[in-house]
Amino acid sequence: MKRKLFWICAVAMGMSVFPSFMTQATPATQPLINAEPAVAAQTEQNPQVGQVMSGEQGADAPIVAQNGPSRDVKLTFAQIAPPPGSMVLRGINPNGSIEFGMRSDEVVTKAMLNFEYTPSPSLLPVQSQLKVYLNDELMGVLPVTKEQLGKKTLAQMPINPLFITDFNRVRLEFVGHYQDVCENPASTTLWLDVGRSSGLDLTYQTLNVKNDLSHFPVPFFDPRDNRTNTLPMVFAGAPDVGLQQASAIVASWFGSRSGWRGQNFPVLYNQLPDRNAIVFATNDKRPDFLRDHPAVKAPVIEMINHPQNPYVKLLVVFGRDDKDLLQAAKGIAQGNILFRGESVVVNEVKPLLPRKPYDAPNWVRTDRPVTFGELKTYEEQLQSSGLEPAAINVSLNLPPDLYLMRSTGIDMDINYRYTMPPVKDSSRMDISLNNQFLQSFNLSSKQEANRLLLRIPVLQGLLDGKTDVSIPALKLGATNQLRFDFEYMNPMPGGSVDNCITFQPVQNHVVIGDDSTIDFSKYYHFIPMPDLRAFANAGFPFSRMADLSQTITVMPKAPNEAQMETLLNTVGFIGAQTGFPAINLTVTDDGSTIQGKDADIMIIGGIPDKLKDDKQIDLLVQATESWVKTPMRQTPFPGIVPDESDRAAETQSTLTSSGAMAGVIGFQSPYNDQRSVIALLADSPRGYEMLNDAVNDSGKRATMFGSVAVIRESGINSLRVGDVYYVGHLPWFERLWYALANHPILLAVLATISVILLAWVLWRLLRIISRRRLNPDNE
């Protein structure tokens, strides 16, 4: 009986546990009969990779505040891909890439790649494809279908925003096949063309960041942002000379950080900006939106929220007076590495060593040989990999007054390494300067030291052992590109269908050593002036001293917003060329104070009365009236230097018009024959707008040359008119050669006279020696 009761209890307990066990063991998925709808629903949420589709909005978007401001940006390949923007992906060079950044105070919530590409009609469908990577993560695959062959194809691919970082690289990899067996990767039928109108659609959302100066200059300048840095400057009213100097220092420092991106500094008087901005305020003069801020007892730099928008930040430069603001500005330019917290007090900025001429950080040093490692702008710049390695480029920013006329060449000591060719062939390294070929060197198949002592020809031909190589005259400008191309003769498979030879191609690797050097230390500084091209390309002659310590800027009394904007944009542009702020710039509003000064003069707004009658001025813009001098013969090309007779002023024309106009003129300083004056003039607010646009636009600056640049709605017209003067120093024999270089007939006459005189002297000397030898008693 007890045994029966035991079994009954055991069965009852087992039945009570069974339902809970069944609940835990139930499969997470639905039964097989319902699996197909579930998979379909999942496919709708996560589209199948490789599908050419319109893209899903908001997929994988990061979680951010819903009420934050956002902006939509379309980045075309024409903007962010290497020039010209389009890409031709081939069998031996299947990769192409674009790069873009993301500001640290923003996050991407949506991203979509829009492709416009044309595949070769010889490709095998489906087997050929385009793989898309973001930061080396595979985002998707676009297969080439039969209908797409030889036709322009439009496709979209969504990008997961979670993979987007501060710096991003989208890499396209072409996998192409044109036959099933015995393919040649170098076949000309293997290609896929990606159009320059392809692009990337991004939605950025702004983050509400803390007021913390330890991240400075973010958010006022973010190196991850490839756009022109537009940074308004806010004043209580027309600034005094001291405040003009302080704001110029800040603008030049931000210009030195902006570099190739460009910069723009809109000026506001007692207005609230609508974006991140710099505000200057003293205890007595401050914008109305800061009237309740407590007075300060020292130079203070503080980061605050915009009164109406917490997503916008203001950097307020406070001081008791303009002297404090000047000290605070120097603190921004030279002491920002110590910034932290919401505010800092600038106690002292003390210079320890004076700057030297031509020591701008962005310029190649001319006092000693420079290593290529010093010229690098990013890691891995001096190396390349691939079946056909991409070219290695080195930028050389030089002072525009470097005198190379009688130079025999520029010495380079190149140390390089490369993947050795398997056999001795015609693989080589080509060296070019400013897209002009210099020389090539064979790549040996033997292990040996690869070091070259090369002299870049500047104006003379290059002698290479057995052969005279004819080199066109190479003219170095302010910005130069030195390029190394490694050309490999890669063995490729071949054969027939029945007897096919195949193997896996191996990438080649090339490296230019960081210890390679180039030497510009043996050359003089000498340049004919006026030359607005030197100003437009390098900020010369003001940039000769990187801190602008030998520059005086003459401003109007009580300048308006447009005139202040011209000052800030000009010094910002010069800072971008030199890489150093204008901490020692002198600003004045009294034109009489420049008399007798040993300094280069920058005039903004209007030429002082004492200079208006100077015979060297070739353009004057004043209100609705303007006049200009035109030369006897005008040359349309900047590189052609006309004769003195062609430059002579033939006519002076005076006109009156209500249309806007601006101009830039250069002439010799009447107070020092080694100094120059450059004036930036405009006749109206629209004229200043065109002038600022020309200063900020590198393409428009490239059209400036000579002594006069007239800026109108139609564009910029430059003239070479008036006298030439020379700035710099040459030894007397170099100066004589320079003077005779443009007068070959006179040079030939002088050479003939010199030969005759030398022959006569030698003849007389030989007669004296002969007479003494024949008549020793007459000594």
What are these regions (language model features)?
Residues 1-9:
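Bacterial N-terminal signal peptides that target proteins for export
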Residues 9-15:
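Hydrophobic helical h-region of N-terminal Sec-dependent signal peptides
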Residues 15-24:
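C-terminal segment of classical bacterial N-terminal signal peptides
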